[in-house]
Amino acid sequence: YTRPEVFVLETMGRDAGWLAASTCLTGDVDLLVLPEVDFRLSIFLEQVRAKMEQQGSCYVVVSEGARWYDGTYLSANGKAADGLGHAMLGGAAGRLKSMIVEAGIVPRCVVQDLSRVARSSNFAMSLVDLEESYDLGVSAHMRSAKPEFTGQVVGIRRGQGVDGGYNTEFFACPASDLANFVRPFPSEWILPNYQGVSDEALDYFRPLIQGEPKLICENGIPVTMRPFNRR
C-alpha cells in the first residue's frame, strides 16, 4: 500500500528476544521491542512518529514477552499457562497498535502474529536448521541406549571449527539444570531507542540461516508430517 501505515509483527519469545532480534537480518525492521528492555511508551511513540515523518511507513517487530518498566507484560491476561505459573501471552502487537492509533500517529496499523506460522513453516527452515535438528535427535537417541541416560536433555553448544568458522557440539545435562531457565539476548547487542541490534548480533545470526533444503512437494504443496493425534 502507498498510504501511511505502521506494520507490527509479533514473534514468540516470552523472556528472551532472540527470535524478534533475528528479524533484523532482513534489513527492513525500523523499530524493535524486546523483553530485555523496559518498554517506555513515550520514547517508542516518538520513534514511530519520527519514522513516519521520514519515510511514510514504519515496520515494528515486538516479542510477545515485551514488558513495561515495572515488569508487567504488555499482553498478559492474568491467567497461568502452565505448572510453572507462566502467564498466557499473545497480543503485544495488538497493544502497540492501539497505542499508536490512539496517539494519532496514523489512522491505520496492521498487525501480524507469527506464533503458529513460525512453528509450522517447515518450508522456511535453513539447511543448518534441518541438519542440526536431525543430528541433535540422533545424538539423543544414541545416548538413550545407556541405562544411566535418564532425566537428561541434549543441547547444542556453539563454538568454532578448525578454520575459525561456525561449528557446534552436542552435550547432555540433567533437565533440572535447564528447566525454567532463560538465556537472555545480550544487552550489549541491543541498540538504544528501539533501533534494532548491533552488527555483532547480525554476525552471530548469519551462520544459522545458511543453506536451503530441498523441499518435497506434492501437487505444489510442501509435504509435512501429520501430528500424531491426527493420524
Where are each of the predicted segments found?
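Accessory alpha-helical/coil subdomains and C-terminal extensions
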Residues: 1-110
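C-terminal non-catalytic interaction/assembly regions of soluble proteins
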Residues: 77-231
